[in-house]
Amino acid sequence: MEPTVADVHLVPRTTKEVPALDAACCRAASIGVVATSLVVLTLGVLLAFLSTQGFHVDHTAELRGIRWTSSLRRETSDYHRTLTPTLEALLHFLLRPLQTLSLGLEEELLQRGIRARLREHGISLAAYGTIVSAELTGRHKGPLAERDFKSGRCPGNSFSCGNSQCVTKVNPECDDQEDCSDGSDEAHCECGLQPAWRMAGRIVGGMEASPGEFPWQASLRENKEHFCGAAIINARWLVSAAHCFNEFQDPTKWVAYVGATYLSGSEASTVRAQVVQIVKHPLYNADTADFDVAVLELTSPLPFGRHIQPVCLPAATHIFPPSKKCLISGWGYLKEDFLVKPEVLQKATVELLDQALCASLYGHSLTDRMVCAGYLDGKVDSCQGDSGGPLVCEEPSGRFFLAGIVSWGIGCAEARRPGVYARVTRLRDWILEATTKASMPLAPTMAPAPAAPSTAWPTSPESPVVSTPTKSMQALSTVPLDWVTVPKLQECGARPAMEKPTRVVGGFGAASGEVPWQVSLKEGSRHFCGATVVGDRWLLSAAHCFNHTKVEQVRAHLGTASLLGLGGSPVKIGLRRVVLHPLYNPGILDFDLAVLELASPLAFNKYIQPVCLPLAIQKFPVGRKCMISGWGNTQEGNATKPELLQKASVGIIDQKTCSVLYNFSLTDRMICAGFLEGKVDSCQGDSGGPLACEEAPGVFYLAGIVSWGIGCAQVKKPGVYTRITRLKGWILEIMSSQPLPMSPPSTTRMLATTSPRTTAGLTVPGATPSRPTPGAASRVTGQPANSTLSAVSTTARGQTPFPDAPEATTHTQLPDCGLAPAALTRIVGGSAAGRGEWPWQVSLWLRRREHRCGAVLVAERWLLSAAHCFDVYGDPKQWAAFLGTPFLSGAEGQLERVARIYKHPFYNLYTLDYDVALLELAGPVRRSRLVRPICLPEPAPRPPDGTRCVITGWGSVREGGSMARQLQKAAVRLLSEQTCRRFYPVQISSRMLCAGFPQGGVDSCSGDAGGPLACREPSGRWVLTGVTSWGYGCGRPHFPGVYTRVAAVRGWIGQHIQE
């Protein structure tokens, strides 16, 4: 498909000259604010789609570098006649045709196009100066047929009337006063009223709502269970949070209850409406919860009445000032630790918070599409089950406007952790656009549909299903993953053929097995791009490699450093499909990534190994030396490919520095590497190859994919790579989705919102509460987990052994629990455990092939483990439990099937808060001296700081090492919460505790996740104090292990098991 042209016209408007800082009051054909050396003009943008759908976008832009004169007011003046055609002629840029173009994407592409045109030398207007920059400052959008191409645009926060009159009054819409001469500010105001509500007293929070008090409130049900909230915006459309539909995407599975106050929907006013279409915002980011909005189309119009009314959508210029009291409503949980939904709709008053203040509370992870509400001291908040519900603010007219949509937060009503809501004023244009174009959705409809085998954007793409830790209730993943194999830690990023990995300095030939994840993509015998092994069926490459490629003719060559296939263990294999990132932009090579599925799985050996995928929060610091490799040109202009794989060492370059070097604002999906003096770089033919960084001795993580650059190895022109951390979620989503039923190989663009699923249990320490910290090592063994997914020995070197205790006594809570009847040896650190020494220890095996996580027996048919163990593999049929054996092989153990997996509903994939899961076994275990449960703690204060407890597991016995063949035990010391927060300042919640030693040396490690932190009481009973969760590396000084505090989730556990 040929790209279409977006014609950008900057058309000067006559205007009255005003002071530089004053707002301009504009009439029908006037626009502009005048300041010294600054001209503010309207950009009219005509986007001509091949589908013949046209949109006209008026933007206000600040043009800098040219002088303003009064002659610009006259269309007949020389200045006016010089400026207009110059801009019309010069400001053109190409857009790849999209299925639809959202407002957010339109504005971003427009700004990039303008900057690209002005990048070199600006646009000279002779005597009037040179335009050096054009920054967008405002917009209005509507169908081309409805809006005159030359219409004006109001500046700043001025309200734009239907006749282009500008109104500077604050929030003039629907205030029962006509401010526009055409009355458009009071049109469409049958909204936000409470006709059934007569007692609008002041709401203080935590109260039951009366019937008809929130007539716009909807309950979204999946399988007859309330899952999320929503708000009515017109008779056929609801608005909710996009993350509500990560797990369940088929609109036919959803039913909306409106007009209801009771969760049962028993009132006569309740209407049950079937959902026919779900449209997520195309820029929704499940990693950050940015653009967290979706609209739902109903099968038939709603009957408006006293109990069913729409809420008012605010204008984009509507101001909701900080400290304004607003209302939230929903059927979410009443308390964070009381997981029962109320029968009656709840309401509460919250206060809008200053954006900068909220950003400081959440580590500056807020975007302009978010708004915070609540109180600094907590106590009032939305909670799980409220997601998608409304945050409404009453204006003097008595109408309620939708200020926000319940999105996310840390915990519920915690101090200094207010609720975060999607800001509707920033999203209302897209909402209106999506709901007025029901016949051509702007984002993927969630009805399942296989992606078409075409290189064009599919008309009904399937949206991948993942779970995201926000305020919606977590549901178990039902995506079967039997056919996916993602490498475990010790199987990824290693180079078994290299006994002593030498330091890469650049420009050398590589030996077979030195870069075992390197792939050559060939059409026939022609090498055209590189690729990288990330799984037994999966490769990553650059999307631009497949612009003009027939997938069925492509073969992947790997297992050898020779382009001719000599030496090593060469393998040639076809491709099943190629999935390009849905936001791939060939113009600027943004989102330049493709996932390649192989026709058959690889057999890993010392010449073929996957590289480790980093976590979304992993950092590759500036200056870090990483390795690039490929068979690309060895010098610029020389098209001869080397016969031997080339490798070179490059340094990570600061993003801002790189943007300056390229005079182009690099996106977050790009990362630069090389040297300012040039000399070392990737080149033509290397595209799609790896930029791999050695994060632990001999363990490499994929930081980037070779994408683009100017020339090769030129001075101050480093290579630009696709940043994997930003796209990790999408990669895993494709790898975790069902294979599409395609006979021929295909290239697909999957338009979908995705959320990263770690392949090995996420790890957290991070800079913000919503994301884990770089270097946080997940304790799961299996897939790559984080930047320093290395493991430290559970050896306690020279530590005081755990003191012997008197004989255990019977406990009324759980008969026989917490007793260790077999001989209890003294713990000296890092020693092997004997049979029956820790009878509650369980080994969880994935597909009965390998140990993946630990678990703890807490009742006859219940195990407790870490929720992050099941992020990727959530199907209980894939898991088996071995009990009663200290041997990693499972020898002499009791094998039990897992029937169900229940993650804690508050589990947060990114912060690892509430990192706990219950596993229900298919049948009760056979108790013996080798198999018995541990005691659960009472919901009482934690053991005293400094208490010595025991950790056990089969995890790595040293950072970066292999698994222990026999169960290991070590003594650790409980650290105070204050000490823990000193080591991990941001990410420690009240559901976490730290254990270890400040000097390091003793810790749990990769493969220990889900295992027990057990403390012995004076009575002799062993009590489960913590569940192994995460940490930075293993056994490092000042980075103790972090455990889920079991007492904090004791109530939830008790709801599931009967003791």
Swiss-Prot record:
Cysteine pairs bridged by disulfides in the record: C154-C166, C161-C180, C174-C189, C228-C244, C326-C393, C358-C372, C383-C412, C529-C545, C626-C693, C658-C672, C683-C712, C853-C869, C949-C1015, C980-C994, C1005-C1034
An annotated Gene Ontology molecular function = serine-type endopeptidase activity
Q: Which InterPro entries match?
A: LDL_receptor-like_sf, LDrepeatLR_classA_rpt, Peptidase_S1_PA, Peptidase_S1_PA_chymotrypsin, Peptidase_S1A, Tmprss9, Trypsin_dom, TRYPSIN_HIS
> Which terms are listed as keywords in the entry?
Cell membrane, Disulfide bond, Glycoprotein, Hydrolase, Membrane, Protease, Repeat, Serine protease, Signal-anchor, Transmembrane, Transmembrane helix
Q: Which GO terms describe its cellular component?
A: plasma membrane
Could you tell me where the Polar residues compositional bias lies? Answer: 780-798
> Which GO terms fall under biological process for this protein?
proteolysis
Which residues are reported to be glycosylated?
N547, N638, N663, N786
Cytoplasmic compartment ranges equal 1-29
Location of the Peptidase S1 domain:
203-436, 504-736, 827-1058
- Which CDD domains does the record cross-reference, listed alphabetically? LDLa, Tryp_SPc
Q: Where is this site: Cleavage?
A: R202, I203, R503, V504, R826, I827
Q: What does the record give as the function of this protein?
A: Serase-1 and serase-2 are serine proteases that hydrolyze the peptides N-t-Boc-Gln-Ala-Arg-AMC and N-t-Boc-Gln-Gly-Arg-AMC. In contrast, N-t-Boc-Ala-Phe-Lys-AMC and N-t-Boc-Ala-Pro-Ala-AMC are not significantly hydrolyzed.
Its transmembrane ranges are 30-50
Segment Disordered: which positions? 443-469, 758-814
Ranges per topology, Extracellular: 51-1059
Q: Could you tell me what this protein is called? A: Transmembrane protease serine 9
Q: What is known of its domains?
A: The serine protease 1 and 2 domains are catalytically active, whereas the serine protease 3 domain lacks the essential Ser residue of the catalytic triad at position 1009 and is predicted to be inactive.
Q: Per its UniProt entry, which superkingdom is the organism in? A: Eukaryota
State what inhibits or activates this protein.
Answer: Inhibited by serine protease inhibitors PMSF and 4-(2-aminoethyl)benzenesulfonyl fluoride, but not by EDTA.
Q: What is its EC number?
A: 3.4.21.-
**Which SMART domains does its entry note?**
LDLa, Tryp_SPc
| Domain named LDL-receptor class A: residues | 153-190
Q: In which tissues is it expressed?
A: Expressed in fetal human tissues, such as kidney, liver, lung and brain, and in a variety of tumor cell lines. Weakly expressed in adult tissues including skeletal muscle, liver, placenta and heart.
